[in-house]
């Protein structure tokens, strides 16, 4: 009886934490601006196009992660297992001379 109660309590806790995590992820993404309609005044259309431009810039911007960090690139070069994959400078290439 007590084992069954613990199982249901852990399932309930996991489900609630999963729902909270999914809710925060859904709020993090920007929402598309509402279209004011075809017969809207020029000021509303200008605001809509400005908001739409901002929305498009947000969702299409480039995102840079840890791989572009110079410190991680140096550590990858130092701790790599084989030396075959290390990029060579173009001056080491015999065809350049």
Swiss-Prot record:
Its main location: secreted. It is found in: Secreted. The modification Tyrosine amide is found at residue 64. It comes from the Eukaryota. InterPro entries: Pancreatic_hormone-like, Pancreatic_hormone-like_CS. Expressed throughout the brain with highest levels of expression in medial pallium, basal forebrain, preoptic area, midbrain tegmentum and trigeminal nucleus. Pfam families: Hormone_3. Disulfide bonds: none annotated. Residues 1-28 form the signal peptide. GO terms for cellular component: extracellular space. NPY is implicated in the control of feeding and in secretion of gonadotrophin-release hormone. Belongs to the NPY family. This is Pro-neuropeptide Y. The gene is npy.
């Amino acid at each position: 009886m007590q084992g069954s109660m613990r199982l249901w309590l852990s399932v309930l806790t996991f489900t609630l934490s999963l729902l909270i995590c999914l809710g925060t992820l859904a709020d993090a993404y920007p929402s598309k601006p509402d279209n004011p309609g075809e017969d809207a005044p020029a000021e509303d259309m200008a605001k809509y196009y400005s908001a739409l431009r901002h929305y498009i810039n947000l969702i299409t911007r480039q995102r840079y992660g840890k791989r572009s960090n110079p410190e991680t690139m140096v550590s990858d070069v130092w701790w790599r297992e084989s030396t075959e994959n290390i990029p060579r400078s173009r001056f080491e290439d015999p065809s350049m001379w």
